[in-house]
Regions:
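Noncatalytic, basic helical substrate-engagement surface that gates or grips nucleic-acid strands
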Residues: 1-131, 137-155
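Residue-level signal for secondary-structure boundary elements
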Residues: 35, 39, 127, 170-173, ...
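A conserved hydrophobic position in a structured secondary element of the catalytic/binding core
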Residues: 132-133, 192
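A short, charged helix-loop
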Residues: 154-183
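Helix-hairpin-helix
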Residues: 179-194
């Protein structure tokens, strides 16, 4: 939950619920903005990154921080903060069960892979909007798939990808291969991505 670090909201009992509030607000905003006929929310499955870590042991290795991302009273250290975030994620999943949305998590599969599969294969027809701050999804942009970045408040279609990144959506993954991906701890091609 990225909103965990920017929404230090406490409930009446002093329990940190910023991630829950921020997540549900962003989903509500997207529903109001795009008026979809169906909403699918996808989470990483248990052990979702294991397959990639077997191929490359440093995959996403830099993501575990040793510093505090949120300074909420009552959370004394990074482990308290992580535990609180996971509790909020569990509550978000419980709340989603009460809403008219499809909630998906498949053990051994990262959310990114499930989202790509759903957008391209499970729901092949009609316009789809992927809501994410992860630019990796820009490789999926096509005539019927767009990406909404809630942090940039921008909808990426093929033209927007080309305009911002000077590469077509179809070639976005190739550019990422050359550049590398710091968020996943993957180096680029030496001599090109220096």
């Amino acid at each position: 939950i990225r909103v965990f670090s920017v929404m230090p909201t406490l409930n009446d009992n002093g329990v940190h619920v910023g991630g829950i509030v921020g997540f549900l607000k962003s989903i509500g905003f997207a529903i109001n903005m795009f008026n979809p006929t169906r909403v699918i929310i996808v989470f990483d499955g248990k052990g979702g990154s294991n397959r990639r870590r077997k191929l490359y042991s440093d995959y996403k290795n830099k993501r575990r921080t040793s510093y505090r991302v949120n300074r909420v009273a009552g959370l004394e250290n990074v482990e308290d903060e992580r535990r609180n975030m996971y509790l909020q994620l569990r509550r978000v999943a419980e709340y989603l069960e009460l809403l008219p949305v499809t909630n998906i998590s498949v053990d051994g599969i990262e959310a990114d892979d499930a989202i790509a599969y759903i957008a391209k294969s499970v729901i092949p027809d009609g316009e789809k909007v992927i809501m994410s701050t992860d630019k990796d999804f820009l490789q999926l942009v096509s005539d019927d798939i767009k990406v909404w970045s809630p942090t940039k408040k921008k909808l990426y279609d093929k033209e927007a990808v080309l305009e911002e990144y000077c590469v077509t959506a179809e070639n976005f993954i190739m550019a990422k291969i050359f550049e590398g991906d710091k968020s996943d701890n993957i180096d680029g091609v030496k001599g090109i991505a220096t």
